[in-house]
């Protein structure tokens, strides 16, 4: 198929995703309130994310890579805007949204309709017209496409870590049937952590607090990069399940490390590859070894705890 993602956007589900996002945003009550810190961070992140996507789109269009361009804008709307950004700025149930975040959200939505327009001309015209009041002579067809704007590669990269942390905490809730109304504590056990994103993580994970602390035996732990995190669970932890999950990750990392070591053990590769490529492989080796060390220690601790209980 030439345009594999076209059917996704033309399907009822694809159209519904856009209409549902519009209904959500237009259904908010707007008030003159201070912008929450988490929403301010979300706006800066999505601005940087849109800039990176537009740069990628421009490159794809210049090289006639239409399928790739469609994939970029599809993922930007579905994964980043609908699944992450809107949830980060969404006000609490029954509460208004601050005017600053709302204006930014309308601006982003308008940019997205412009980027989608070449692939979905009719629905994007309707949505674009519905976002704000416009003169009858205005049309998305004669509106200039958005420029790249302010790029911030570091912020975009940092947010991948944020999303991985949020996804891990949500998985812990799901696996143990812990309702969202029950606040959790997130512990930073070891490694680097930037507390600039605390408010976003706290909101998205429904946390009571984020602290630097050693994990106890009742904690469910996970790794993002080489940083270890833990969520204390009291007596609800399933030791056998945790050990099994960690062992599966150990097995995967051992295989991954073996493939990296094989590559680094190839003298021709080390001699002829670019220095930055070799350095990247060595970083993969170091990261995998660090993760394996942490996981093996955690498995032993959990097995020891289980033996003590018995």
Question: What is the predicted role of each segment?
Answer:
Residues 1-8:
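Short, small-residue-biased leader/transition segments that mark boundaries at the very start
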Residues 9-310:
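Feature 926 captures the class I aminoacyl-tRNA synthetase adenylation module centered on the KMSKS loop
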């Amino acid at each position: 198929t030439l345009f594999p993602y076209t059917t996704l956007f033309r399907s009822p589900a694809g159209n519904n995703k856009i209409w549902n996002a519009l209904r959500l945003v237009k259904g908010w009550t707007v008030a003159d309130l201070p912008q929450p810190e988490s929403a301010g961070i979300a706006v800066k992140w999505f601005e940087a994310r849109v800039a990176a996507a537009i740069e990628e789109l421009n490159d794809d269009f210049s090289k006639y890579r239409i399928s790739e361009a469609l994939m970029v804008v599809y993922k930007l709307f579905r994964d980043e805007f609908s699944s992450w950004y809107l949830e980060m700025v969404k006000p609490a149930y029954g509460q208004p949204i601050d005017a600053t975040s709302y204006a930014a959200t309308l601006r982003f939505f308008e940019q997205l309709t412009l980027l989608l327009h070449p692939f979905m001309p009719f629905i994007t015209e309707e949505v674009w017209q519905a976002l704000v009041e416009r003169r009858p002579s205005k049309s998305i067809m004669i509106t200039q496409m958005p420029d790249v704007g302010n790029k911030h590669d570091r912020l975009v990269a940092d947010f991948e870590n944020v999303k991985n942390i949020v996804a891990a905490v949500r998985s812990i809730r799901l696996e143990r049937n812990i309702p969202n109304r029950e606040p959790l504590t997130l512990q930073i056990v070891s490694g680097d952590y930037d507390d600039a994103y605390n408010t976003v993580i706290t909101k998205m994970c429904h946390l009571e607090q984020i602290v630097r602390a050693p994990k106890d035996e009742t904690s469910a732990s996970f790794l993002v990069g080489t940083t270890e995190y833990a969520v204390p669970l009291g007596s609800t932890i399933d030791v056998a399940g945790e050990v099994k999950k960690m062992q599966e990750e150990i097995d995967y990392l051992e295989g991954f490390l073996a493939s990296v070591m094989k590559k680094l053990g190839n003298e021709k590769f080390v001699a002829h590859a670019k220095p930055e490529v070799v350095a990247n492989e060595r970083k993969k080796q170091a990261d995998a070894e660090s993760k394996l060390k942490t996981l093996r220690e955690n498995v032993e601790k959990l097995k020891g705890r289980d033996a003590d209980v018995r």
